[in-house]
Amino acid sequence: MQTNELITWPTLCVFGDSIVVGSDDREAGGWVARLRLDFNSRERISVYNLGVDGDRSEQLLRRLSPEAAARNASVIVIALGANDLGWQGSAGTDNALFRERYDRILSEAGRFTRRILTLGVLNVDESNESHGVSNRQVLAFNAIIEELTRARAADFLDLFGALEPEDFVDGLHPNASGHAKLAPLIARELERLGWDLS
């Protein structure tokens, strides 16, 4: 018997970066942990937090398939792009390369399920200059993510503007209040899509 044959209920796999990891939410461990608590209180579903600090599109492209296969993914959520923008002086991924990699990520995800939800990159607090990211850059990446998502008949949730300056620890990473705002927005979108997670 293979390991993934033991999983008999739906599995929601959330792929992404440190924002998905949620370590800056000292109250509940991030929006994915909050989503897990919400879903587990109502229905039988496995929610996997597959966020990795510092991940860019290049790293996610390498790990998505084996991790989705190991968990027999029923639904895949992709929340990626902040590190590709480059921050704290690091070089970002140019738009053309980001487009190519993100399209390949969607293609890989599509091998496991048609139920794919992509999340737009969060707005940043530009008054905090420590991260070096502009909302203009964020919007350019979000346009790419939305276009590629729609082209593959997947679903896109725009979260730009969902958070206020006080919802960040450093202008880029959400704090507990930021994660508390994100979790119900994402849960409602999953419910709106009508995917049977029970």
Where are the regions a protein language model picked out?
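Serine-esterase "nucleophile elbow" of acetyl-processing enzymes
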Residues: M1-D53, E58-Q59, R63-N72
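Alpha-helical cap/lid subdomain in secreted, periplasmic
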Residues: L6, L37-E43, L61-S198
